[in-house]
C-alpha cells in the first residue's frame, strides 16, 4: 500500500482538469469505497452461509489479481522526460503552511487508530460478528456516496470549508463511541464516520497536491502517506494500551479530543495562509 499510494495520487493530480482536483480525488475515493462495500458484503454473505475465514480470504485474492492485470493497460500522458534526481528530502522546499499542516496531521494521526478498534467497540456493545460486517458495509457505502459531492464542494468553496468540518465530524464521532451505548446510536456513528472519510479524502489530497512543487508532487504525497503510516502505527499501539489499561472508552476520548483540537489548528493554519496571500496581493 505504501508503494502504490503516492504514485497513484500523483497520477490523479496529473490527470485532473484544472479546478476539478477535489472532484477527481473524490471519484477515486468513491470507487475505492464502492469496492470496499462489495468486499464487506461478500464477506458477510460468505460467513452467513457458513464459509470459514481462510477460504473467504483466498477468494479476496481474485479481484486483486485482476486489478494488477489491468494496470499495464493504463497509458500516462506523454510529456518531457522527467529529470533524474537523487532520492533525498534535503533540497525539498515546502510552503510554511504545508509544513504546519503536516505537523497537525501527524498530531491528528496519533488519535486516528485502526478502524479495527471501531469494530471491536461495536462488538463490545453487543453486535455479532456478522452485524459488525454490516456496520463496516454501512460505513463504506456512506463514504462512497458522499466522496464525489465532498470533493466537488471543496473545488467550489475551498478546501478549508470541507476539511475543518471533516475533522470536527471525526472528533464528535469518536466522542460518540465513548459516550453512546445503544445499537441505533452506533449505527448512526458509522454513517457519520463515512461522512468524515468522504470529507477528508478528496479535499486533503487536493490541498497537498496544489501546495506541492510540480516537480516534487509525488515526493510530497509520499511524505503525506509516510506521516499517515507512522501515525497509524503509533496510534494503534497507543489505543491498544489505553484499551487494556483504562478500558474501551479511553482510546475514543483521546481520539475525539485530538480530532477537535486538530480541526481548530487547521482552521488557524489555513486562515493564516489566506491572510498572507491577501496581503501579498495588496502589496
Locate predicted features.
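Juxtamembrane intracellular "pre-TM" segments in multi-pass secondary transporters
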Residues: 76-104, 283
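Helix-loop junctions on the cytosolic side of multi-pass membrane transporters
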Residues: 63, 71-85, 268-279
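Helix-to-loop junctions at the C-terminal end of transmembrane segments
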Residues: 47, 146-158, 243-244
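Short amphipathic helix-loop junctions that connect adjacent transmembrane helices
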Residues: 116-132
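Structural signature of the two symmetry-related core transmembrane helices
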Residues: 61, 161-176, 256
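Symmetry-related core transmembrane helices of the 12-TM Major Facilitator Superfamily/SLC fold
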Residues: 55-72, 252-268
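Cytoplasmic helix-loop-helix junction between adjacent transmembrane helices
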Residues: 1-32
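Intracellular juxtamembrane helix-capping segments at the cytosolic ends
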Residues: 4-16, 199-212
Amino acid at each position: 500500500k505504501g508503494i502504490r499510494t503516492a504514485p497513484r495520487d500523483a497520477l490523479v493530480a496529473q490527470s485532473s482538469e484544472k479546478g476539478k482536483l477535489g472532484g477527481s480525488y473524490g471519484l477515486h475515493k468513491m470507487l475505492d469505497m464502492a469496492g470496499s462495500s462489495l468486499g464487506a458484503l461478500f464477506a458477510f454473505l460468505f460467513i452467513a452461509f457458513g464459509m470459514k475465514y481462510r477460504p473467504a480470504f483466498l477468494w479476496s485474492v481474485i479481484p486483486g489479481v485482476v486489478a494488477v492485470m489491468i494496470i499495464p493497460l493504463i497509458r500516462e500522458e506523454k510529456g518531457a522526460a522527467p529529470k533524474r534526481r537523487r532520492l533525498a528530502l534535503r533540497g525539498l522546499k515546502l510552503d510554511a503552511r504545508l509544513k504546519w499542516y503536516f505537523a497537525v496531521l501527524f498530531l491528528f494521526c496519533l488519535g486516528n487508530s485502526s478502524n479495527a478498534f471501531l469494530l471491536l467497540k461495536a462488538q463490545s456493545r453487543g453486535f455479532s460478528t456478522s452485524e459488525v460486517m454490516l456496520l463496516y458495509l454501512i460505513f463504506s457505502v456512506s463514504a462512497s456516496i458522499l466522496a464525489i459531492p465532498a470533493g466537488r464542494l471543496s473545488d467550489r468553496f475551498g478546501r478549508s470549508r470541507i476539511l475543518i468540518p471533516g475533522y470536527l465530524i471525526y472528533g464528535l464521532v469518536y466522542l460518540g463511541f465513548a459516550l453512546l451505548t445503544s445499537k441505533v446510536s452506533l449505527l448512526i456513528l458509522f454513517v457519520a464516520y463515512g461522512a468524515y472519510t468522504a470529507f477528508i479524502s478528496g479535499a486533503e489530497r487536493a490541498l497537498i497536491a496544489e501546495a506541492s512543487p510540480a516537480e516534487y508532487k509525488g515526493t510530497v504525497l509520499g511524505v503525506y502517506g509516510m506521516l499517515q503510516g507512522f501515525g497509524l502505527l503509533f496510534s494503534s499501539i497507543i489505543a491498544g494500551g489505553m484499551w487494556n489499561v483504562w478500558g474501551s472508552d479511553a482510546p475514543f476520548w483521546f481520539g475525539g479530543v485530538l480530532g477537535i483540537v486538530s480541526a481548530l489548528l487547521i482552521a488557524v493554519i489555513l486562515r493564516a495562509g489566506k491572510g498572507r496571500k491577501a496581503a501579498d496581493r495588496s502589496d
